[in-house]
């Protein structure tokens, strides 16, 4: 049986914390920033945790990542 490979796309987009949580960048923050308020742009720049319902599936795809 071949080894499970780490998903290359997720490897670049997800960061694992020391406690095992998955961190991701938020959507809607890359362009058209002039039409958003300063508060929106500031809050969107922060990383957020992956929702618990998605975490199990994502952890399976990046199982070999440390």
From Swiss-Prot:
GO terms for biological process: translation. It comes from the Bacteria. The keyword Ribosomal protein applies. GO terms for cellular component: cytosolic large ribosomal subunit. Keywords: Ribonucleoprotein, Ribosomal protein. PROSITE patterns: RIBOSOMAL_L35. It holds the Pfam family Ribosomal_L35p. GO terms for molecular function: structural constituent of ribosome. InterPro entries: Ribosomal_bL35, Ribosomal_bL35-like, Ribosomal_bL35_CS, Ribosomal_bL35_sf. Belongs to the bacterial ribosomal protein bL35 family. HAMAP family: Ribosomal_bL35. This is Large ribosomal subunit protein bL35. It comes from Acholeplasma laidlawii (strain PG-8A). The gene is rpmI.
């Amino acid at each position: 049986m071949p080894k499970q490979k780490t998903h290359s796309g997720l490897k670049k987009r997800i960061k694992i914390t020391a406690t095992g949580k998955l961190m991701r960048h938020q959507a809607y923050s890359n362009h058209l920033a002039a039409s958003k308020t300063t508060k929106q742009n500031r809050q969107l720049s922060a990383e957020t945790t992956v929702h618990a319902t998605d975490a199990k599936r994502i952890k399976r795809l990046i199982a070999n990542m440390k």
